[in-house]
Amino acid sequence: MAVGKNKRLSKGKKGVKKRTVDPFTRKDEYSVKAPSTFQIRDVGKTLVNRTSGLKNANDSLKGRIFEVSLADLQNDEDHAFRKVKLRVDEIQGKNCLTNFHGLDFTTDKLRSLVRKWQSLIEANVTVKTTDDYLLRLFAIAFTKRRPNQIKKTTYARSSQIRAIRKKMTEIMQREAASCSLAQLTHKLIPEVIGREIEKATQGIYPLQNVHIRKVKLLKAPKFDLGALLNLHGESTTDDKGQKVEREFKEQVLESV
């Protein structure tokens, strides 16, 4: 008889399953708050592993980026084709305070804009806001028919495209460099810059569907908690100085 392992004895009991622990029992739920520049502040909830040992839950949450539809933030379906990126910068209690991190168009919207018989013009510019955020703005525009035009096509000449692109970069540079990130966000929501470009280029070639299709955050300044709390409307300190009035008393020297 061969000496070896008895296969029957080594087998465990059938039907006994390994006890599994639900991973969600170790997690906490945090609320994600959008800046006060948007109408709807509550973005949603996010999960994170509970603080244990050297692993802090706050450190895991900081830097998280959420992509939210602008239609949800503004409670307006007309903005459904735009997506806003929000970055978690600070944790207060069970709330994640976020800041603007970028903007983008949905793919289906971009595909629907591109059509036959028209010229597509794109421009991008790198600009620094007054509060030292380095951004790259991408603009898109399409030519349209002039009033009483009979010809089917609306192709612009290369010289006209260059002139339009120059105007686009100038307007984007001017509008973004003269304001803070929060003020720029206010301009991006109602598409103020797109309308400015459309108005300025009317004499070169009439345009339609002019949009800032993408905003990319390249570099952020050193984190400022006070500025973030002001952005969320949660600042309790009064930054304004108060005038100090003191009665002037002339000093008399007793001995010279």
Curated annotation (Swiss-Prot):
Record InterPro entries: Ribosomal_eS1 (IPR001593), Ribosomal_eS1_CS (IPR018281), Ribosomal_eS1_euk (IPR027500)
GO CC annotation: cytosolic small ribosomal subunit
Compositionally biased tracts (Basic residues): 1-18
Stored SMART domains: Ribosomal_S3Ae
GO molecular function, one term: structural constituent of ribosome
Matching Pfam families: Ribosomal_S3Ae
Residues covered by region (Disordered): 1-20
Predominant localisation class: cytoplasm
N-acetylalanine: residues carrying this PTM: A2
Record keywords: Acetylation, Cytoplasm, Ribonucleoprotein, Ribosomal protein
Top-rank taxon, per record: Eukaryota
Subcellular compartments: Cytoplasm
GO biological process: translation
UniProt record similarity statement: Belongs to the eukaryotic ribosomal protein eS1 family.
Quaternary data: Component of the small ribosomal subunit. Mature ribosomes consist of a small (40S) and a large (60S) subunit. The 40S subunit contains about 33 different proteins and 1 molecule of RNA (18S). The 60S subunit contains about 49 different proteins and 3 molecules of RNA (25S, 5.8S and 5S).
Protein name: Small ribosomal subunit protein eS1
Name of the gene: rps1
